[in-house]
Amino acid sequence: MKNEMLALILAGGQGTRLGKLTQSIAKPAVQFGGRYRIIDFALSNCANSGINNVGVITQYQPLELNTHIGNGSSWGLDGIDSGVTVLQPYSATEGNRWFQGTSHAIYQNIDYIDRINPEYVLILSGDHIYKMNYDDMLQTHKDNLASLTVAVLDVPLKEASRFGIMNTDSNDRIVEFEEKPEHPKSTKASMGIYIFDWKRLRTVLIDGEKNGIDMSDFGKNVIPAYLESGERVYTYNFDGYWKDVGTIESLWEANMEYIGEDNKLHSRDRSWKIYSKNLIAPPNFMTEDANVKDSLVVDGCFVAGNVEHSILSTNVQVKPNAIIKDSFVMSGATIGEGAKINRAIIGEDAVIGDGVVIDGSKEVEVIGYKEVAGVPNED
């Protein structure tokens, strides 16, 4: 079996900075934009880029993520020559197989990669919101005769110290990599998206393990090793919308940016669709007293209150006189009569009691999965 490029999505992160939202699910399984989960963006990019085989590497709380991905049919990745394979840690005769880092997760799955036998491997994070044509990145990789290509995004200089920064020459060849530098020399921030020549990466990972050299992380170990050995390492410059939604604030911001006709993600672009697992729900119902403005309301919602600049996911109930503003409400949540919610993220199947006030005007408030805030009305 031969495929030119295999995609490997790193989806095992716990996402501790998302607090209550990831207590029972992996970060890539967190809901986004009303009808999606975060991993849908990486999977859809793969499908739209013509990548036939995708490995999803999981670790922390994988059940919801595994169920969501299923056999890959939602992304058209269930054909004779295509597929999604969920790769989890396992025990072997040589010992524990728990993943120790990003590149260690790849090393532990060499047998799977060898079965696909790709010429190139595309490494992706499963927790970013963006649209990218990976085929364009691969062409750049080939044109540069690169051994490794790193996707980068120009960021404001004041924010550059939060990222791994790539310093390049005039031909976009990387001459230096700095991990979260205090005084950055450039603004080219790594997006955590890499294309490697598989044979070379395979050798580097195996030799590192054999010789006791730490090669467990791409940013800390592998990229510096490539640069030190003189490998041809280049950037792929991306200028579209990209958001790391690893914090409560950034997840809320991304959802708010998703609303409206002028959303930066161009969600209505039919030439590059974002696919997800289809959920069957009845049509929305809004009472005559409902007031919905500048909001995204997904199927199955019952709205009898007021909703402004917010997202209501599948099967959300908003009872009379409730007010929701600048908030993201996940599927199955119930908002009680007269409740007031401002700048908040309400988790799946959460219940907000009658008259409860959740005010995130100073800091975005979060109600977790199945959490009950206040005493719900038994009716």
Curated annotation (Swiss-Prot):
Alphabetized PROSITE patterns for the sequence: ADP_GLC_PYROPHOSPH_1 (PS00808), ADP_GLC_PYROPHOSPH_2 (PS00809), ADP_GLC_PYROPHOSPH_3 (PS00810)
InterPro entries referenced in this protein's UniProt entry, alphabetically: ADP-Glc_PPase, ADP_Glu_pyroP_CS, GlgC_bac, GlmU/GlgC-like_hexapep, NTP_transferase_dom, Nucleotide-diphossugar_trans, Trimer_LpxA-like_sf
One annotated GO molecular function: glucose-1-phosphate adenylyltransferase activity
Example GO biological process: glycogen biosynthetic process
UniProt-listed CDD domains: ADP_Glucose_PP (cd02508), LbH_G1P_AT_C (cd04651)
Domain of life: Bacteria
Pathway where it operates: Glycan biosynthesis; glycogen biosynthesis
Catalytic activity: alpha-D-glucose 1-phosphate + ATP + H(+) = ADP-alpha-D-glucose + diphosphate
Enzyme class label: transferase
Keyword terms, alphabetized: ATP-binding, Carbohydrate metabolism, Glycogen biosynthesis, Glycogen metabolism, Nucleotide-binding, Nucleotidyltransferase, Transferase
EC number: 2.7.7.27
Binding sites annotated in the UniProt record for alpha-D-glucose 1-phosphate: G164, E179, K180, S190
Subunit structure: Homotetramer.
Family (UniProt): Belongs to the bacterial/plant glucose-1-phosphate adenylyltransferase family.
PANTHER family recorded: GLUCOSE-1-PHOSPHATE ADENYLYLTRANSFERASE, GLUCOSE-1-PHOSPHATE ADENYLYLTRANSFERASE-RELATED
Role summary: Involved in the biosynthesis of ADP-glucose, a building block required for the elongation reactions to produce glycogen. Catalyzes the reaction between ATP and alpha-D-glucose 1-phosphate (G1P) to produce pyrophosphate and ADP-Glc.
Classification via NCBIfam families: glgC (TIGR02091), PRK05293.1 (NF003670)
Name of the featured protein: Glucose-1-phosphate adenylyltransferase
Origin species: Streptococcus agalactiae serotype V (strain ATCC BAA-611 / 2603 V/R)
